[in-house]
Amino acid sequence: VVSALSIHHLSDEQKRSLFERIYGALNDGGVFVNAEQFRCATPERHRFHHERWVTRVRELGAAEPDLAAALDRMKFDRAATLEDQLEWMRQAGFRDIDCAYKNLIFAVYCGLK
């Protein structure tokens, strides 16, 4: 199962439930991979990384109206910390859980059934 930039729209309880449902849907040895936005462990760190992301997006040439629209949409995000999400995967039964990539407020993590 592969997901990208979707699960952060769910409540924490819905995230936990979804991880359990994904685990149940996988065959033994199956893999769940999620590319996701996350909330940093502290508000200060999150603000710092979010500001760096905005700066980088501007450096890469994002149009200001597009960036403004993205920032407006982000107000409705319900991101959880990366640590919480990895723990919820463990609780659902996943093993060999790993964060394969992390940059600012984005990560790719995975686990095996």
Could you tell me what each predicted segment is?
Residues 35-92:
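C-terminal alpha-helical "lid/dimerization" subdomain adjacent to the S-adenosyl-L-methionine
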Residues 32-33, 96:
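A short hydrophobic/small-residue beta-strand
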Residues 86-113:
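Core SAM-dependent methyltransferase catalytic element
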Residues 1-2, 89:
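Hydrophobic beta-strand segment of the Class I
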Residues 2-3, 33:
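A conserved beta-strand element that flanks and buttresses the S-adenosyl-L-methionine
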Residues 16-28:
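A short glycine-rich, Lys/Arg-flanked "PGG" loop and its adjoining helix->strand segment in the class I
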Residues 8-10:
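A short His-aromatic
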